Amino acid sequence: MCIRDSIMSYATSPTQRDVMLLGALTAIGASMERYVRCPYAGKLQSPCLQSFIVAPSASGKGILSFIRLLVEPIHDEIRQKVVEEVKAYKKEKAAYDTMGKERCKVEAPQMPKNKMFLISGNNTGTGILQNIMDANGTGLICETEADTISAAIGSEYGHWSDTLRKAFDHDRLSYNRRTDQEYREVKKS
């Protein structure tokens, strides 16, 4: 049985099959990162597929939750590495903090990036940017309720619809915060 048939076997109606196919293509495209490229507009581009499924209540959109299962192993592996890196960082930081005057001779340990593959749709504009940047421009927002996305985008600290448009075109993403003089960017999303 091919992967398409395996994915489609969860669907029980034509609507659910459409939702599963669109969701699977989007998730698989996101998981390809920069391993697959094609020429577009004079540049080599990797897949950046975006799906937003709109249909009446109880019409079968909920089956999209199964799509998340396709990419959870990727997310879980990344998160496990982050846990291990944070553990190592805390150990190094504790040793660094006890060095006393010797600290000036050694570079302070750096907190590891909070990498993830599955990015929460319930997020701020800067949060989305940080998640994408920490993952080197790759990630997937997979929410089963449109309200989660629309509420976050429309909130006071949301407004990340421009980030989605920039990511689609693989444009540079950046932000600057005066408070800590923090500037971050990813040259290609």
Predicted regions and their residues:
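Phosphate-handling catalytic cores of nucleic-acid transaction enzymes
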Residues: 4-189
